[in-house]
Amino acid sequence: MALKIRLARAGSKKRPYYHVVVADVRAPRDGRFIETVGSWNPVLPKDAERVKLDAERIQHWIAQGAQPTDRVLRFLDQAGIAKRPSRNNPTKGEPGKKAQERLALAKQAEEEASAKAAEAAAAAAAPAEEAASE
C-alpha cells in the first residue's frame, strides 16, 4: 500500500482549514485516511499556530515509506523534520528563442551603428591632422 502525507481540506466555504493526514494514494482527498498528524490553518497570520505537526508520528510514517506531498514537504522543511531539495532551473528565466533572436539583431544593429559613428569620428579627425601637417 503506497502512502502519502498530504492535506485534507476541512472548514467551511471561504474559510479553509487543512488536516495533515497519512492516507493511501488511492483514497479521495478528503476521504478515508489512516492517521491525522497535523493541521494547517491558512487564515491565521504567519506564526507558530498556523502549522501544527506531530514530528514523532511524521518521522514514523516516513520510515514506513510514506511520501509527503510538495506542500507538506515545505512545512516539514520549515519545521526541520525533513529536507526539501531545492529546484534549480537556471534556464527558466532566460528569454525564449524568438526574443533571443530579436536581442541578437538589436545588438548587431547597435554594433554597426557604433562602428559607423567611430568611422565618422575618424574621418572627421583625419582631415584636421592632414591640414596641420601641411
UniProtKB/Swiss-Prot annotation:
Keywords: Ribonucleoprotein, Ribosomal protein. The keyword NAD does not apply. One of its GO terms (cellular component) is cytoplasm. GO terms for biological process: translation. GO terms for molecular function: structural constituent of ribosome. The keyword Ribonucleoprotein applies. Residues 79-134 are annotated as: Disordered. InterPro entries: Ribosomal_bS16 (IPR000307), Ribosomal_bS16_dom_sf (IPR023803). Residues 115-134 have a biased composition (Low complexity). SUPFAM superfamilies: Ribosomal protein S16. Pfam families: Ribosomal_S16 (PF00886). Belongs to the bacterial ribosomal protein bS16 family. This is Small ribosomal subunit protein bS16. It comes from Brucella abortus (strain 2308). The gene is rpsP.
